[in-house]
Amino acid sequence: MRIFHLGKRQMLAFFVPGFLLGIIYVNFAAEKYMAEAGIFSDLFLSQFADMQIDIRSYLPYLIRLRAVPLLLLAAVSFTRLRKAAAILFLLWTGFTGGVTVSSAVYGLGLKGSLLCAAALLPQFLFYIPAFVILLWYCISAPGTRWNRQKTIFVIAAMAAGIVLELWVNPELVRAFTVLFRMRA
């Protein structure tokens, strides 16, 4: 008996409601926390522009942040819970994305949405395809087989994303914060 029959387009059917729930959460349930100064404030942006990142501390943090969800999803992908795990992952990712973007817009307005875009580039151009391949396998297995090419691609894409997030993204976000500090 098939409980879930999902295709590639249906992945968005779980991500988008999660995203909308994140927006609703920020606007209604977490509204009292939005008034507090946080990372989406002009003060934080001005401090970030002058901050130096310790690469030796940041690299292990990034590896944990990016590899742990990937490895957990990969481990579950070989069990009967793979479709449920993929759906929960998509809902959770959508929810956290909605919370993040809404919080940024609430705190900084248009600058906040642009900051979110800057914070995702360029590493998410590699993370997204890696996770989509793994999620697609979770959704379409056992009809789809995992192979060496998928493994190599996912590992290479994640490694490239981590390198870009470590070296390129901080400078991109710093340039963004300097640009908006000059215009303020």
Where are the regions that the model predicts?
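Alpha-helical transmembrane segments of helical membrane proteins, especially in multi-pass transport
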Residues: T93, C116-S140
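Cytoplasmic juxtamembrane regions at transmembrane-helix boundaries
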Residues: V76-G98, N147-A159
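Interfacial helix-start motif at the membrane-water boundary
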Residues: F48-A75
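N-terminal signal-anchor transmembrane alpha helix
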Residues: R2-A35
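Hydrophobic alpha-helical transmembrane segments of integral membrane proteins
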Residues: W92-P122, L166-P170
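Terminal transmembrane helical module of multi-pass membrane proteins
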Residues: I133-A184
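Perimembrane loop-to-helix junctions flanking transmembrane segments
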Residues: E36-R56, M182
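Alpha-helical transmembrane segments of multipass membrane proteins
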Residues: G18-V26, P69, Y127-A130, A157, ...
